[in-house]
Amino acid sequence: MHEMSIAMSVVEAVVDKAREEGGGKITGIDLVVGRLAGVEVESLKFCFGAAARGTLAEGAELVIEEPEGRGRCEACGAEFPVTSFYAKCSACGQFRVKIESGRELAVRSFTIE
């Protein structure tokens, strides 16, 4: 389960930044996890609680935005939603689709007291 390592990395990064800023307890963390990122969001939420235990992030509210996958056909230029990396163009039927978004995995912001 790589969600635990992701949760641990998020906690470490946010706690380190909070300390740099001279802040106290972290009360909220906003993440962006694209639907094509290969992350089980519910597992990540569960793992976050364990990873944050005993840190400045313990008890912080975790808010996760899940942007949809978007692709652009390299044959005809059409843009459309995709649910996998092996997408067929909805306009011309070609399989030459470049994934434009949906793979995001980032801390958008966090709140400290």
From Swiss-Prot:
GO terms for molecular function: nickel cation binding; zinc ion binding. The keyword Lipid biosynthesis does not apply. Zn(2+) binds at C73, C76, C89, C92. Belongs to the HypA/HybF family. PANTHER family: HYDROGENASE MATURATION FACTOR HYPA. Involved in the maturation of [NiFe] hydrogenases. Required for nickel insertion into the metal center of the hydrogenase. Ni(2+) binds at H2. HAMAP family: HypA_HybF (MF_00213). One of its GO terms (biological process) is protein modification process. It comes from the Bacteria. Gene3D superfamilies: 3.30.2320.80. Pfam families: HypA. InterPro entries: Hydgase_Ni_incorp_HypA/HybF_CS, HypA/HybF. The keyword Metal-binding applies. This is Hydrogenase maturation factor HypA. It comes from Chlorobaculum tepidum (strain ATCC 49652 / DSM 12025 / NBRC 103806 / TLS) (Chlorobium tepidum). Keywords: Metal-binding, Nickel, Zinc.
